[in-house]
């Protein structure tokens, strides 16, 4: 006796007691027969059984899937994508009735009705749009609520890298988060997590929101800077992840924004999982509490001979190396320092010697203060 012949009596028992649509009946047995179409199998099993009543399990939900398909198409009309997946929310009573049938007739290892609904919606959407169904890494994800009749859509985040030059002083690197949602995104900040765009982060975010759409932008900075610092040369590298973007391609490789210039825009797989190692070349203008001379300044050369210990308030200790150092005396109580160092060295604290050893004040044996410092290069190792 074939497997098909074995399931016919069970199917007939079910149909005597319950009216089932082709989809719901076929789903109970397709896996046993290694078939792909629930509807065709259900139709075959019901060839001698006719009924005009509503399906006991789904209440003829499958006859109405085109309504939800059109809802999906409308939701996706503003998105660029090549792959998708579908999730669904259905009435608990439908799932309960499905469980009753499967339990009563000991039908194990079969798809639940929720799985079948999402599969059917996926097939219909793929056929209509020619997009690929991808359950592992889709570019957009639909959540179709068949209970309350609405469709939610989310797109896969998009990560970009780039570099920015900041030729003006008095411009912050980081943007203050929205006070209402603490950066999570709300109606007040248009779900961006920030209400203003008056920083490096703000200007880049605003540019990308206009080009790509999206909600929040999460930055990974390769080093930080003072509000008064200039970022020169090829600029400071950064990574930014855009949540729920509408577009997935950025034609612009550079942008001249109001206060900064961005270059080398490119889409990357993801932001770095671990902090990247980098070197910074800085020009710092330093004032001293006492008169300095060339002989005293020569002591600064010793800073390249051993690591600089940096102590944080948390108790963490790290070591940074000064790779090269030059100086130029400005007047009796000030000089300019040109030095290259491993990323993570706090420049102002290095000058004053505040929890940094040895610091410039310690080397010169006098109180020193960093008036301002500018970055000439940030080199990722």
Curated annotation (Swiss-Prot):
EC number(s) on file: 5.4.99.25
Annotated Pfam families: Pus10_C (PF21238), Pus10_THUMP_arc (PF22023)
InterPro entries, per database record: Pus10 (IPR005912), Pus10-like (IPR039894), Pus10-like_C (IPR048741), Pus10_THUMP_arc (IPR055174)
Gene Ontology MF terms in the entry: pseudouridine synthase activity; tRNA binding; tRNA pseudouridine(55) synthase activity
Active site as annotated: 226 (nucleophile)
Top-level taxon of origin: Archaea
Keyword tags: Isomerase, RNA-binding, tRNA processing
Gene Ontology biological process terms from the UniProt entry: tRNA pseudouridine synthesis
Catalytic activity: uridine(54) in tRNA = pseudouridine(54) in tRNA; uridine(55) in tRNA = pseudouridine(55) in tRNA
NCBIfam families (alphabetical): pseudo_Pus10arc
Family label: Belongs to the pseudouridine synthase Pus10 family.
Function comment: Responsible for synthesis of pseudouridine from uracil-54 and uracil-55 in the psi GC loop of transfer RNAs.
UniProt-listed HAMAP family: Pus10_arch
The name this protein goes by in its record: tRNA pseudouridine synthase Pus10
Organism the protein comes from: Nitrosopumilus maritimus (strain SCM1)
Name of the coding gene: pus10
